[in-house]
Amino acid sequence: MSYVTGNLVKQSVISVTLSPALIVLNTTAEQTFTVNGLLPGDHVTCNKPTAQAGLGIVGCRVSAANTLAITFSNNTAASITPTAGQTYLVLVARPDSTITDGNI
């Protein structure tokens, strides 16, 4: 059964400096980072500030309170380490917990 939980209570952009670990060739890997204030149920999108050939972000989520999980994809035949010390932008949308009938 699906239901609508209403509008957003809060939406904000967080800047967080990250140093992801190596991603082995031709794979995806989820890595977690501490980001204070995140809550389970928050919707997040992530933006890496620079492009790296063969490297992409294919998903991000809040895996636990204060924990951002980013899934990186390495589409090359060599290992890639995302650039260390970069400031990622994370858009956080926190839904209202009030259940509605779906009419906006």
Regions found by a protein language model. Give the residues of each.
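Short, surface-exposed alpha-helix to beta-strand junction/turn motifs within ectodomains of secreted
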Residues: 38-49
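Short solvent-exposed loop/turn micro-motifs enriched in small/polar/acidic residues
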Residues: 26, 53-55
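Residues in well-ordered beta-strands of folded domains
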Residues: 45-47, 71, 91-93
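Extracellular receptor-binding modules and their adjoining Ser/Thr/Gly/Asp/Asn-rich linkers
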Residues: 1-38, 68, 79-104
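Structured beta-strand segments within beta-sheet-rich domains
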Residues: 56-86
